[in-house]
């Protein structure tokens, strides 16, 4: 439900208070989650942690930095990212949420593509939002705008 309220409440507030500050992509408004960095401002993993350090480092729970990844990474890459975050920063929680791509005929596709490299069919893409996997095609207008605004990181973005 949280992903739908980010759009619905922002839309209602924008109608009642036209000057209110929301995130937006053209006419599609949305709110970001709590004290998260606005998705348009994300540059990379390290810079996200540096930005959030002062505030989120004060918490012992109830907050998380989501690393929304363009695609899958290896277990060793994930360990390296988590180790760097835990060694260099004080934020209490981090999640790594890659986009997973699936062809209806050929299964999981590792490449960062929209069509199956074997048959050319459009891929179904899934990413974790609000704690569970959702098909990106099923996002509401606000969540789609947020997704389109967000930088999807790669392993190479770890030092940015």
Features from the language model and the residues they span:
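Long, C-terminal-biased catalytic regions of enzyme "large/alpha" subunits
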Residues: 1-160
């Amino acid at each position: 439900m949280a992903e739908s309220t980010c759009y619905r409440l922002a839309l209602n507030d924008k109608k009642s208070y036209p000057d209110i500050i929301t995130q937006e992509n053209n006419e599609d408004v949305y709110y970001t989650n709590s004290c998260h960095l606005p998705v348009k401002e994300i540059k990379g993993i390290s810079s996200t942690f540096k930005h959030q350090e002062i505030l989120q480092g004060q918490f012992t729970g109830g907050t998380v930095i989501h690393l929304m990844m363009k695609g899958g990474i290896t277990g060793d890459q994930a360990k390296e990212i988590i180790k760097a975050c835990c060694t260099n920063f004080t934020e209490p929680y981090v999640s790594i949420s890659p986009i997973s791509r699936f062809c209806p005929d050929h299964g999981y596709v590792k490449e960062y593509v929209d069509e199956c490299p074997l048959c050319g069919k459009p891929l179904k893409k899934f990413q974790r939002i609000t704690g569970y996997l959702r098909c990106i095609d099923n996002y509401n207008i606000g969540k789609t705008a947020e997704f389109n605004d967000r930088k999807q990181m790669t392993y190479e973005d770890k030092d940015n």
